[in-house]
Amino acid sequence: MSNDCTCPVTGRVDKPIASSGRANRDWWPHQLNLKILHQNPPLGNPMGEEFSYAEEFKKLDLEALKKDLYALMTDSQEWWPADYGHYGGLFIRMAWHSAGTYRTGDGRGGGGSGSQRFAPLNSWPDNVNLDKARRLLWPIKQKYGRKISWADLMILAGNCALESMGFKTFGFGGGREDIWEPEEDIYWGSEAEWLATSDKPKSRYSGDRDLENPLAAVQMGLIYVNPEGPDGNPDPVASGRDVRETFGRMAMNDEETVALVAGGHTFGKCHGAGPATHVGPEPEAAPIEEQGLGWKSSFRSGKGGDTIGSGIEGAWKPNPTTWDMGYLKVLFKYEWELVKSPAGANQWLAKDVDEEDMVVDAHDPSKKHRPMMTTADLSLRFDPIYEPIARDYQQNPEKFADAFARAWFKLTHRDMGPRSRYLGAEVPAEELIWQDPVPTVDHQLIDGQDIAALKDTILASGLSVSQLVSTAWASASTFRGSDKRGGANGGRIRLAPQKDWEVNQPAQLKTVLQTLERIQKEYNDAQSGGKRVSLADLIVLGGCAGIEQAAKNAGQAVSVPFTPGRTDATQEQTDVASFAVLEPAADGFRNYLKTRYTVSAEELLVDRAQLLTLTAPEMTVLLGGMRVLNANYGQSRHGVFTKRPETLTNDFFLNLLDMGTVWKATSEAGDLFEGRDHTSGELKWTATRVDLIFGSNSQLRALAEVYGSGDSQEKFLHDFVAVWEKVMNLDRFDLA
């Protein structure tokens, strides 16, 4: 007899799908995660491979869109009523929390991909009820369709919210493209519970409250700080330390931090009308009938004046829908008493409040409340560095408005890369130092004949293949696909801080740069017209020449593509502190590890490959080529599996896969190895974990076998040259 409940595929009744069983990572939790190299593939993008968001954005009537957003601000909906009849505070928070996940340590996070729509961000405790903000935006997104991404719309809505309440913003640049699945490459922390305090297992803190890198939030599920204070302790001075650390890791200095907090908290209110026990599960855990909405509340109406969010309740100042100096006035005018909100959260209320400073209730005009401050807010008054900055802003309203406008623009655009990527009519004309500016091309570029002649000159200069390749790699490989920073354009490898980074071998780098600068000067001086070559271009061209020579050494003729057009930035255009975060702590492609880390060297390699936007095959062929080109840090022999270095062959893979070699760890940490002849015991090679992972990991070994096959030399050369060109041009947004 048939069973109608039996699965027609497996014949089983219960749990017939793959996601119901144990995954490979459940069996082998330390398995190397290569999936982060293949996120958001074209097959998962409904827009199709021919879709160009930049072209669609050009068709957008930005003025009409903004008018619709302005109208939305005061179009209060019964299903989620607007506080004070204005959604401005909600949309500012949505935009802030979209952009505010950015951290300088690895450039990840931020609002550049619309990731707030997906887990985990859509369900973070700090993003409570922002699902409602996005649903309020849906009719507008639906109207304009592909011409505006969710990523751009969320930021623009924040701008329009500010403008609709009387604030003049600094500008807006579009160009953020949506992703279509959660980002898996971002490390948000190791804690196993939301909002875990620093005393819990797997804490992100060590020592004297030292926050783990690259994290930029104090607890799992928060954007920055706990508004109640460190671990909920209502200490404004201690909170100031947390604020400084987290905002600093988001690229904000003290002045920008004060401006952002004071400016942002000029608007809206916090929500803690009742106990959090009334709040239902977050969107990712909510039942299917909720259709992606979460945090359904059973407290009275569950909305409007009964809303429960952060647990803190109230507004910071009177007129929460108007730009004015009220926040700073109230902050310094009153003394503050610590109280518990109706939800039980620590917060502060002003004492002996004048009638003019009382806050009208957000939903019942017959009620008034005392202004409130969070512990984090009070750090602006009691932190010895923040306090004078805040008082200066209070006494200089125009300075404060300008500082907030600039800080807001930086907050919402920091992860977009150079100004050339911004789209739209509201892009500010002013060039800002944090945008890593490079000069525009103001000269005639070198042509094919010049390129060939310069290659010959470089190869005759006495510089080795290793030196040329290493220098070009050092220049280009600073690029981060996360925030579109770094890369060879600008030639900043010759400037502080990059010229002094240990990984760049400053002594060797100086020699190479002096030689290339001489070649550059001789060439430019010989030109009668306006033709010039930049050092940035010459550095990359030197790497191309080195690779062609290495292929020639192997008896192969290859032409490495080169496109001129890079320019040389000045030291004045380079923020040393800002660029310092680009220094590699590890670069597996150069077999460099600054120190030993709790994370394995092979995981750090994959992480860097992901930042370089490489696929697993690209990472594999690139590393194999770099090894035989002898491009290791310090000319180390680890992983140089060839008897003919500086010859572009697939020897790395041939010798890695040789079953006649027996490997044994030679360091207590298990990060250095010797490979000896299986029969004689003679030492053949030395290696690091980064080298041997290509023979150990089953996926990487499968790729290594492709390049280690007898007929693979031509494919190896082709694929290596292709990925080399890709890395050299990662920051060439002008070529897109």
Curated annotation (Swiss-Prot):
Entry GO CC: cytosol
Task: Name the Enzyme Commission number(s) assigned to this protein.
Answer: 1.11.1.21
Q: Which Gene3D superfamilies match?
A: 1.10.520.10, Peroxidase, domain 2
Show the cross-link location (Tryptophyl-tyrosyl-methioninium (Trp-Tyr) (with M-250)): 96-224
Q: How is it modified after translation?
A: Formation of the three residue Trp-Tyr-Met cross-link is important for the catalase, but not the peroxidase activity of the enzyme.
The protein's job, in short, is: Bifunctional enzyme with both catalase and broad-spectrum peroxidase activity.
Q: Which residues bind heme b?
A: 265
* Annotated source species: Pelobacter propionicus (strain DSM 2379 / NBRC 103807 / OttBd1)
User: Which Pfam family, an example, fits this chain?
Assistant: peroxidase
Q: What is this protein called?
A: Catalase-peroxidase
Keyword flag NAD: no
| Record GO biological process | cellular response to hydrogen peroxide; hydrogen peroxide catabolic process
Q: Recall the GO molecular function terms of this protein's record.
A: catalase activity; heme binding; metal ion binding
- Quaternary structure and partners: Homodimer or homotetramer.
